[in-house]
Amino acid sequence: MTSFFDSPSKVIGASIALRAVLLVYGAWQDAHSPIKYTDIDYFVFTDAARYVSRGASPYARDTYRYTPLLAWLLLPTTWDSIPGFFAFGKALFALADVVAGWLIAKVLVSAYGMSPSRALKYASVWLLNPMVANISTRGSSEGLLGVLVVGLLWAVLSRRVSLAGVILGLGVHFKIYPFIYGPAVVWWFDAERDGSGSPRGTATARAAREKDDGQDGQGILSKAVDFLTPARIHLTLVALATFSALNVSMYILYDLPFAQNTYLHHLTRIDHRHNFSPYSTLLYLSAAGGARTAFESLAFIPQLLLSVVVIPLVLGKKSLAGTMLAQTFAFVTFNKVCTSQYFLWYLIFLPFYLPSSSLMKNPRKGILVGLLWVIAQALWLQQGYNLEFLGLSSFVPGLFLASLFFFAVNVWILGIIVEDVGGSA
């Protein structure tokens, strides 16, 4: 297999071929099977695009909870006169997968010092992953986020501060969750890494600190001055400007439905179907009772405390990619809604984490982690099949216990990731 990974064209070609085969198979399954290959969300996307093509708002389509940019990108799916163009969005998402994989290899070579062949091996964890290819070819837009997230990592590690700010602002506008990377990126960009001086700050700041050593108030002020490096300020301003410009533009075009569906809806979202989260049963009971409870908003507290505060502060100076992996894993694990598409949010960081991880150094441990993660999903899916296809009431105890087991496995894996990243140089 060494010769295979020595050729970027072969690896990229194989990843494209995998997705092409799945696209063709998906079209066949949709036409011949009662169980459809295409994700229901894809029909939501394309319906929204059709409304836009008629001069209406994408939010005229019920359950469209995304930026208008996505509906705009899928306008070619409304060109009914051109055969096959309804699948344009799937092809776009699949292509985005491949671009994200190419960026992964690029970062591994430029920032991690890997040889191109070794970088392609690890990038293939994403490029040749059938789960990744399946989700994108079913019509999930996560591949687009993959490009933005890896693009953000590349821009930061390349010290392209303006570009990193633009990508971060665009990513948060496109889908809320990339905001968690803001603290990690800002914390990582100290004075040493942005080239403006030593990590202890400028000469003026150091002189002030030495003069006021022992004075707590002045010491805190000095640390605050040290923290505000040019790169951190620049990145924050560019990201906020990009995010604000996009949101103001969309609000002018689509008014309150844009804000409500794209952002506010997620604060009190109730979604108990296809949900791996242990909150799913509580969401089901809440929906069945017709009453909203405080936990729908309180559920954000442990999730955000871990992913936005604790993990970036503890790990941010160790490894940026490793920190982003831990943040994303915590965010998804503790989210009140967790679907298969969300797994792609953290799987994209595996090529950066695996080379120095304990899972590679101890293969038995790696195999055990992989098996438990798959088994936990399989147990949940078996209960979900009983509910969705057999009509059995399996919310309690079946789905609830399966969700708790999956949650426990993921918390254990998160602990391994944090320990590995925390121990890195």
Curated annotation (Swiss-Prot):
One of its GO terms (molecular function) is alpha-1,4-mannosyltransferase activity. Its main location: endoplasmic reticulum. The chain crosses the membrane at residues 11-31, 85-105, 144-164, 166-186, 233-253, 295-315, 340-360, 367-387, 398-418. Keywords: Cell wall biogenesis/degradation, Endoplasmic reticulum, Glycosyltransferase, GPI-anchor biosynthesis, Membrane, Transferase, Transmembrane, Transmembrane helix. It is found in: Endoplasmic reticulum membrane. GO terms for cellular component: endoplasmic reticulum membrane; glycosylphosphatidylinositol-mannosyltransferase I complex. It is a multi-pass membrane protein. One of its GO terms (biological process) is cell wall organization. Pathway: Glycolipid biosynthesis; glycosylphosphatidylinositol-anchor biosynthesis. It is an enzyme of class 2 (transferase). Its EC number is 2.4.1.-. PANTHER family: GPI MANNOSYLTRANSFERASE 1 (PTHR12886:SF0), PIG-M MANNOSYLTRANSFERASE (PTHR12886). Mannosyltransferase involved in glycosylphosphatidylinositol-anchor biosynthesis. Transfers the first alpha-1,4-mannose to GlcN-acyl-PI during GPI precursor assembly. Required for cell wall integrity. Belongs to the PIGM family. This is GPI mannosyltransferase 1. It comes from Aspergillus fumigatus (strain ATCC MYA-4609 / CBS 101355 / FGSC A1100 / Af293). The gene is gpi14.
